[in-house]
A protein has these predicted regions:
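Bacterial N-terminal signal peptides that target proteins for export
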Residues: 2-11
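Structural signature of tandem alpha-helical TPR/SEL1-like repeats
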Residues: 28-35, 63-72, 99-111, 135-147, ...
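Pro/Ala/Gly-rich low-complexity, hydrophilic intrinsically disordered segments
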Residues: 295-353, 360, 372, 406-409
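Hydrophobic face of amphipathic alpha-helices that form TPR/SEL1-like repeat modules
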Residues: 51-58, 72, 87-94, 123-130, ...
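TPR/TPR-like alpha-solenoid repeats
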Residues: 55, 76, 91, 112, ...
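Bacterial N-terminal signal peptides
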Residues: 10-20
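Amphipathic alpha-helical coiled-coil segments
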Residues: 377-406
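Short helix-capping/linker turns of helical repeat alpha-solenoids
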Residues: 42-45, 58-60, 65, 78-81, ...
Length: 409
């Protein structure tokens, strides 16, 4: 028995030592790769400057440092690297490490877009569509979206479909909208998948089909799309295409509300107020209505006003207690929402960076930058996707934690 224990102890120690050695080797490899990147960047290699900037921008293997990232992106952009120009546009649009400037964002997006960078073309189109660049121009927006869509940029394909669905530049054309949505959906765009579900649910250009709608919503929800999650909740709440199930409805609403979907927040308020599938909880109802109302949801504003007046008129003490509980619930949900939003943005950006590195590998940039080379650029892309996968696991953990702390069914 003692001998077996001794052997087990030796095995455990051996495994621990092996794991430690592997980690040490991996750390040494990362340090060597970073040293190589720094050297190449100092020698003026634009691909290396861009890649090293990504490390500082994300804090991957180095201390996060926006100033160093911006300086390196700037050097790469000065050499005409479209990927760096697009990234500078994003940084100015978001105001990361510097004052927000839509004008400068548009300038950098345009520089990259005229070089054929699909992401920049899409981003430039969004500034025209929203008017954030100083001028609302649907014609310019659609023109840039089409250019990006011709390069199979999924979000741009979805936007082209949206223009046809809404009729921004003429009559609505549901058939063309569906064509573009399907193309984007096949490329993994969750917004397009959700829109296809919406069109099937309402029968826009197709025969109304709740089952097909639910199928598309599930595809989009699997990617974390909050609008699709809210739509699934609605179908379960009202028994459309499925048997009515309040517990399923609340589960999906809760997922969507965690990402700030105001319709889902309002629906959770309604379900808590009237005890649909759960015990009535007026404090929770107030909290959810308030969160949705703070985002300008008109139905929630009306519901919040009506419930507040009812409680104040019936029992002032109950109203006070419910208000305190609601305030605490709002604060907790707001903190969770910020964390979720940050994780999702990082995941999207990492996936985008992976595509940019692959694009550099496939272009002439890799041939002109022998220190980086196509293989190293593709390895960087793999590293970004691995980090995105880690963040997805963390995001999934937040869902599990939220489910365990949600009100009892």
């Amino acid at each position: 028995m003692k001998r077996n224990k001794l052997l087990r102890g030796i095995v455990v120690v051996g495994i621990a030592a092996l794991v430690g050695c592997v980690a040490q080797v991996q750390a040494q490899e990362r340090d060597a790769e970073l040293a190589l990147l720094r050297g190449a960047a100092e020698d003026g290699d634009s691909a290396a400057q861009f890649t090293l900037a990504n490390h500082y921008y994300r804090g991957l293997g180095v201390q996060q440092d926006y100033d160093k990232a911006l300086a390196l992106y700037g050097k790469a952009a000065d050499q005409g690297l479209a990927a760096a120009e697009n990234r500078l546009g994003m940084i100015y649009e978001r105001g990361l490490g510097m004052p927000q400037s839509y004008g400068r964002a548009m300038t950098f997006y345009r520089k990259a877009a005229v070089q054929g960078n699909a992401l920049a073309q899409y981003n430039l189109g969004m500034l025209y569509e929203t008017g954030k660049g100083g001028r609302l121009d649907y014609s310019q927006a659609l023109d840039w979206f089409r250019k990006a869509a011709e390069q199979d940029e999924p979000d741009a394909e979805e936007e082209v479909g949206y223009f046809f669905q809404r009729g921004f530049l003429g009559a609505r054309d549901y058939e063309k909208a569906r064509e573009w949505y399907k193309r984007a959906a096949e490329h993994g765009c969750s917004n397009a998948q959700n829109q296809l579900g919406y069109m099937a649910q309402l029968g826009l250009g197709v025969e109304q089909d709740y089952v097909q709608a639910l199928d598309w919503y599930y595809k989009a929800a699997a990617q974390g799309n909050p609008n699709a999650q809210e739509n699934i909740g609605y179908l379960y709440q009202h028994g459309m295409g499925v048997e009515a199930d309040y517990i399923q409805a609340e589960t999906w609403y809760y997922k969507a509300a965690g990402q700030g979907n105001s319709n889902a927040e309002n629906q959770l308020g309604y379900m808590n107020q009237y005890g649909l599938g759960i015990p009535p909880d007026l404090a929770q109802a107030l909290a959810w209505y308030r969160m949705a109302a703070d985002q300008g949801n008109k139905t929630a504003i009306e519901n919040l006003k009506a419930l507040s007046e009812r409680l104040q008129g019936v029992d002032a003490e109950m109203w006070q207690a419910a208000s305190v509980d609601a305030k605490q619930a709002v604060e907790a949900q707001a903190a969770r929402r910020v964390r979720i939003a940050n994780l999702q943005r990082q995941i999207v950006d990492l996936e985008m960076d992976a595509r940019l590195e692959e694009s550099l590998a496939e272009s002439g940039t890799a041939a002109a930058a022998p220190v980086m080379g196509a293989l190293k650029l593709r390895k960087e892309a793999d590293n970004y996707r691995a980090e995105a996968a880690r963040l997805r696991a963390e995001l999934a953990g937040l869902d599990v934690l939220a489910a365990s702390s949600a009100p009892a069914q």
